[in-house]
Amino acid sequence: MAKSEGRKSASQDTSENGMENPGLELMEVGNLEQGKTLEEVTQGHSLKDGLGHSSLWRRILQPFTKARSFYQRHAGLFKKILLGLLCLAYAAYLLAACILNFRRALALFVITCLVIFILACHFLKKFFAKKSIRCLKPLKNTRLRLWLKRVFMGAAVVGLILWLALDTAQRPEQLISFAGICMFILILFACSKHHSAVSWRTVFWGLGLQFVFGILVIRTEPGFNAFQWLGDQIQIFLAYTVEGSSFVFGDTLVQSVFAFQSLPIIIFFGCVMSILYYLGLVQWVIQKIAWFLQITMGTTAAETLAVAGNIFVGMTEAPLLIRPYLADMTLSEIHAVMTGGFATIAGTVLGAFISFGIDASSLISASVMAAPCALALSKLVYPEVEESKFKSKEGVKLPRGEERNILEAASNGATDAIALVANVAANLIAFLAVLAFINSTLSWLGEMVDIHGLTFQVICSYVLRPMVFMMGVQWADCPLVAEIVGVKFFINEFVAYQQLSQYKNKRLSGVEEWINGEKQWISVKAEIIATFSLCGFANLTSIGITLGGLTSMVPQRKSDLCKLVVRALFTGACVSFISACMAGILYVPRGAETDCVSFLNTNFTNRTYETYVCCRELFQSTLLNGTNMPSFSGPWQDKESSLRNLAKCCDLYTSTVCA
C-alpha cells in the first residue's frame, strides 16, 4: 500500500514537472525505492566527475606549481641574478659608448656616476652609519671640540690671507670686490636686530661655504668645465620646448615673438620639475643639501630645508615644504625663510633667463652659492634669541606629491606652470609700461630745467654706481650695470635680465663699444658680476607675493610677517650683491687670446666680438706719418695684409686712422 502511494506521488510530481519520459520515471521510482532522493543521486555523480577533473588538472599543473613554489623560495636570488645581468649589459654598453666616442657619451657617463654615488651613499648610511657615530664620539668632548674649532678657524684665516696675497698680487683689482664684501657685512651688522646674539659661526661658515663653492665652479678648471657642460646640457634640454611651441604656435611666432619663444620654456620646465618631485629626486637633493648646511652652520631643520628648497622652487612654493611647521617657527627662522626666497630664483624661471641668452653656468652657480649666504646673512641681521622646536633634523619631514602616477605629475606640473606664465607675462607688460611712463615723466620734468635725457635708469646709474664699483665692476661699465641693478630692485628681475641680454647681444654681434659718447655694452667680467647680482627675487614687487603666500599658510602670524618682510628683502638683496663680489674676486679671463693677424686674414664680412677686438688692435697699431701710406707697429709690422685688413676694418668701424 505504501509502495503504491509512493508510485502515485512520484508520478504526480513528475507530471507536474512536465517529465513524460517513461524511462526516467522508472529510474526515479527505483531510486526512490532504495530511499534516495533525486538531488542526492545528482550530487553523487557530480562529485565523482568533479574529483576526476580536479585530479586531472592537478596532474597537468603539477610542474607549473612546483616551478612557482621554487621561484617563491628563491625569489631574492633570481632578482639578484637578473639585476646583475642587467648591470653587466649596461656596463658593457657604457664601456662601448665611451670607447667609441667619450665626448659623445659624457652625459651618460656623468648620469651613471651620479646614480652610483647616490646608491653608495645609501649603502654607507645603511650599513656604516652606527659605526661612524661611534667613531665620532670622541669629538663630543667639549675641550677637544674647542681646540679643533680654534685650529680649523686659524687655518682657514691663514689660508684666506695667503690666498688673497698671492692671487691679488697678479690682479690687484680683485681687492675691491673683497672690500665690497666687508662693506656689506658691516652694513648688515649695523642693521642687526640683536647685535650681541649674532652667531659668528653661522656667518663665517655660510660665507666660507659660498667662497669654497665659488672657487670650485669659477676658478678651478674641472669645476668650471663641469658647470659649463651642465649649462650647455640644460640649454640643449630646454631647446626641446621649440618642438611643442612650434606645433602649437607655428615656427614664425616662436622664432620672432618673446611670448611664444621664452614663456613656453617655463611650462616645459615646470612639467619636468613636477616629474622629478613625484619621483622623489627633488626632495632627496634638498634633504642632502639641508643636512650639510645644518651640520656645518648650526641652523635649525625647518629653516634650512626651506632655504635649500629655494634653489629648486620659488619663493611661495618653498614654504610649502615646511607648511606644518610655520606656525611654531621663531621670528628668526621665519626671517631666514623669507630671506632665502628673496635671495634665490626658482628652477622654473631659470629656463626663461637662459632663453634670454644669460650664461647658464653663472645662473646655476649663483643659485647654489646663494643658499649658505642667505642663511648666514639672515642670522647676522636677525639672530636667534628664542628656543626653536626644530633643532633636530628628524623633526621635519618633506611631503611627497599627491599624484598617483608619473603622467598625472607631468600634467599637473604643466597645468600649474600656466599661472606662472600668465604672471610673468602680465608683470612684464605692466612694469615695462610703468617704466616707460616713469621715464617719460622724468624726461618731461628734466627738460623744464634744461636737463635732457633724464630717466629712471640714469638716476640709478648715478646713485648705485659706487656700490656696483665695490662689487668689482670697472668704472667705465658701472653706469650700465648700476642701471640694470636698479631696474631689478625697483621693477623686476625679468626686465633687468632682458636689458642685460641686450648688452650681451650687442657685444657678441660686434657693435662698437662707444657710439656718440654712450657705452653700448659691458665687458665679460661685468656681465658675470651683473648675472650674480640679479640672481634673486629681491625687488619691491616681491613683497606682496611673499606676504600673500605666507599669510595664506599661517594667517595667525600676519603681523610677524609684515614686521619682517622689509628687513628680509634688503637682506636677500645683499645676498645677491655679496655673491657678485665673490664672482668679482674669483673671476679670471678664460680662453686663448685671439691671434688677430691670422683672424683678420680670413674673409670676414660679419661683425662679431672677435672682429671688433682685432680691428681695435689694428687701429691702435696704425701710425699716420702725414702720408697716404700708414705704417704699422707690433704684430702688424711688415705684414703685407695689414693695409688690406685696415681697409676692411674701416668699412665696419669708425676710427681716426680711417679718415
From Swiss-Prot:
Q: How is its activity regulated?
A: Inhibited by formycin B, partially inhibited by purine analog ara-A.
Q: Which residues form the signal peptide?
A: none
Tissue-specificity statement: Expressed in liver (in bile canalicular membrane vesicles (CMV) but not in sinusoidal vesicles), jejunum, spleen and heart. Also expressed in brain and skeletal muscle. Not expressed in kidney, muscle and lung.
Q: Name one GO biological process term.
A: protein localization to cell surface
InterPro entries in the record: C_nuclsd_transpt (IPR008276), C_nuclsd_transpt_met_bac (IPR018270), CNT_C_dom (IPR011657), CNT_N_dom (IPR002668), Gate_dom (IPR011642)
Residue ranges, annotated region (Disordered): 1-22
List UniProt keywords, sorted A-Z: Cell membrane, Membrane, Phosphoprotein, Transmembrane, Transmembrane helix, Transport
- Report one GO cellular component: coated vesicle
- UniProt feature, compositional bias: Basic and acidic residues: 1-10
Location in or out of the cell = Membrane; Apicolateral cell membrane
What is the recorded membrane topology of this protein?
Answer: Multi-pass membrane protein
- The answer on whether this UniProt entry bears the keyword Phosphoprotein reads yes
Q: Which residues carry this modification: Phosphoserine?
A: 46
Q: Where are the transmembrane segments?
A: 81-101, 105-124, 149-167, 173-193, 201-221, 234-254, 261-281, 296-315, 337-356, 363-382, 424-444, 455-475, 530-550, 568-588
Q: Which reaction does it catalyse?
A: adenosine(out) + Na(+)(out) = adenosine(in) + Na(+)(in); inosine(out) + Na(+)(out) = inosine(in) + Na(+)(in); guanosine(out) + Na(+)(out) = guanosine(in) + Na(+)(in); uridine(out) + Na(+)(out) = uridine(in) + Na(+)(in)
UniProt-recorded Gene Ontology molecular function terms: neurotransmitter transmembrane transporter activity; nucleoside transmembrane transporter activity; nucleoside:sodium symporter activity; purine nucleobase transmembrane transporter activity; purine nucleoside transmembrane transporter activity; pyrimidine- and adenosine-specific:sodium symporter activity; uridine transmembrane transporter activity
Disulfide bridge map: none
What's its job? Sodium-dependent and purine-selective. Exhibits the transport characteristics of the nucleoside transport system cif or N1 subtype (N1/cif) (selective for purine nucleosides and uridine). Accepts purine, analogs of purine nucleosides and uridine, and exhibits high affinity for adenosine. May contribute to regulate the transport of organic compounds in testes across the blood-testis-barrier.
Q: What family does this chain come from, according to its entry?
A: Belongs to the concentrative nucleoside transporter (CNT) (TC 2.A.41) family.
Question: What protein is this chain from?
Answer: Sodium/nucleoside cotransporter 2
Give the originating organism.
Answer: Rattus norvegicus
